[in-house]
C-alpha cells in the first residue's frame, strides 16, 4: 500500500484529518517522567496508544530524539507504532535538504532505518535533493512550501523576478511538486496553518497533492479556517498539532488528557469539513 493509499484508509477508518506530532522534551515531561530523557520512548508510546484511533498520521520530529542521543528510542517507537497502529502512516519530520550521495543516505535513514512512510524535505537545493527519496516506491515526501514560522516570509513570499505576474517562491515549489517533480506520485507539501490565504493558493496550484499543515494549537493556527482553505474532496490534508496535545496535562494523566485534546481537535476539523461540504453542495 502506498503512502497516499494509507492516508486515505486512515482518514476513512478514524474519521480524521488530525496528525499528532511527537516532539518529546524531557524538561516538559509530566509527573513521574519529568526530566528523564531515558523515558522518551515511554512518553511517546503512551501518547500513541491513547490517540491511535483518532488520527490520520503520527509525526515524530527527529531532532527531539537526536538531541538526547535517543535515536534508539525512536527506532523502538517506530516499531511500536507499526505494531499497535499499522493502519496509521508515520511521517518522519526531518526536513532534510542535501544532494547526491548524502541525500541517498538520508533516504536510507528515513525509509530503511526508521521505516517511515513519509519524510519532510527542504527543496532549496533543487530536484537533486529530492530525487533519491522518489526512488522508494510508495513512500511519501513532503516539501517545505509555505511554512508556519514568521521568518518564512524572508524567502518563501518573494517573487522569482521583480515583475508583476511572476510567481512567489512558494507557488513555484507547489507547481513543481504538482507537476515535473512528482515522479513516484507520492509528493506532498508543507503549508502552515498560520497562513490560510496561502493554503488556499497552494491548493489552487496543487489541487491533488496532500498538504501537511502544522501550526494548529500552540502556534495559533485556526483549525476551521485551515480546513476551509485546504480540504477538497479527494485532496487530503493532514493537520498537525503537537504541544497542545502531548502536553495537555502536567500530571500522570497526560495520556488521557492528550486523548481528550486530540478528540476535541479532530471533531473541530471534522465539523469544519462538514460545513465545507454543505457550502459546496448546491
UniProtKB/Swiss-Prot annotation:
It comes from Polaromonas naphthalenivorans (strain CJ2). Belongs to the OMP decarboxylase family. Type 2 subfamily. The keyword Lyase applies. InterPro entries: Aldolase_TIM, OMPdecase_AS, OMPdecase_type-2, OMPdeCOase_dom, RibuloseP-bd_barrel. One of its GO terms (biological process) is 'de novo' UMP biosynthetic process. This is Orotidine 5'-phosphate decarboxylase. Its EC number is 4.1.1.23. NCBIfam families: pyrF_sub2 (TIGR02127). PROSITE patterns: OMPDECASE. The active site is at 95 (proton donor). Keywords: Decarboxylase, Lyase, Pyrimidine biosynthesis. One of its GO terms (molecular function) is orotidine-5'-phosphate decarboxylase activity. CDD domains: OMP_decarboxylase_like (cd04725). HAMAP family: OMPdecase_type2. Gene3D superfamilies: Aldolase class I. Pathway: Pyrimidine metabolism; UMP biosynthesis via de novo pathway; UMP from orotate: step 2/2. The keyword Lyase applies.
Amino acid at each position: 500500500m502506498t503512502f497516499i493509499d494509507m492516508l486515505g484508509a486512515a482518514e476513512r477508518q478514524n474519521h480524521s484529518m488530525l496528525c499528532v506530532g511527537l516532539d518529546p522534551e524531557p524538561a516538559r515531561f509530566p509527573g513521574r517522567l519529568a526530566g528523564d530523557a531515558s523515558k522518551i520512548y515511554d512518553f511517546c508510546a503512551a501518547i500513541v496508544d491513547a490517540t491511535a484511533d483518532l488520527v490520520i498520521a503520527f509525526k515524530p520530529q527527529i531532532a527531539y530524539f537526536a538531541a538526547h542521543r535517543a535515536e534508539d528510542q525512536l527506532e523502538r517507537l517506530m516499531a511500536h507504532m507499526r505494531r499497535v497502529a499499522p493502519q496509521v502512516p508515520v511521517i518522519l519530520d526531518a526536513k532534510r535538504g542535501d544532494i547526491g550521495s548524502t541525500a541517498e543516505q538520508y533516504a536510507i535513514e528515513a525509509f530503511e532505518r526508521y521505516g517511515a512512510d513519509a519524510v519532510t524535505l527542504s527543496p532549496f537545493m533543487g530536484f537533486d535533493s529530492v530525487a533519491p527519496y522518489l526512488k522508494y516506491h510508495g513512500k511519501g515526501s513532503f516539501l517545505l512550501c509555505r511554512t508556519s514560522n514568521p521568518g518564512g516570509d524572508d524567502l518563501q513570499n518573494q517573487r522569482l523576478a521583480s515583475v508583476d505576474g511572476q510567481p512567489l517562491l512558494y507557488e513555484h515549489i507547489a507547481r513543481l511538486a504538482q507537476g515535473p517533480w512528482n515522479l513516484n506520485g507520492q509528493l506532498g507539501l508543507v503549508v502552515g496553518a498560520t497562513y490560510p490565504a496561502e493554503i488556499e493558493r497552494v491548493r489552487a496550484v496543487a489541487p491533488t497533492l496532500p498538504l501537511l499543515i502544522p501550526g494548529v494549537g500552540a502556534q495559533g493556527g485556526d483549525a476551521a479556517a485551515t480546513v476551509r482553505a485546504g480540504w477538497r474532496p479527494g485532496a487530503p490534508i493532514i493537520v498537525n498539532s503537537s504541544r497542545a496535545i502531548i502536553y495537555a496535562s502536567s500530571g500522570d494523566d497526560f495520556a488521557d488528557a492528550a486523548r481528550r485534546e486530540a478528540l476535541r481537535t479532530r471533531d473541530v476539523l471534522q465539523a469544519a469539513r462538514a460545513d465545507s461540504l454543505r457550502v459546496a453542495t448546491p
